[in-house]
């Protein structure tokens, strides 16, 4: 059963997207500065329907998630794994936790991610949640000014790397399965 004390405590979320690593992960580093951080990964059921998804992709994803979880355990944490529509997962999390900030790294945006992020922006704003997206590639995805590309790239490539997260207080959502996609084929996931 869900514990109502979580509606009193303030939480941040570290949303792992394609950045399934501990070291040199600015979003994870920044999220670790806040108490009560919920590290999550969402396997979006609509994403599985895209033509770019395959058994190879799911196997790689599973291996990466297992490795990430092992590394989070070394920090006294655990990855909270959800399977469903990303929008619905966040709505459920907002009902269970008093979320103040969501941290993630930017992702390259195909049509699926453009629409997803647009819908999530609306949801996050309506819930008064700040979404902090860090740049993990040095590529400008927003506010692109061609004359500034070189300078911005030099600034990014000369910036410091981020080490292990600090002061981590990672939370476990007892309602999520924490079972990864191991031994499931692509056909079973669709």
Where are these regions (language model features)?
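Short, Lys/Arg-enriched N-terminal segments with co-localized hydrophobic residues
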Residues: 1-8
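Active-site "lid/cap" and pocket-lining segments within catalytic core domains
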Residues: 9-190
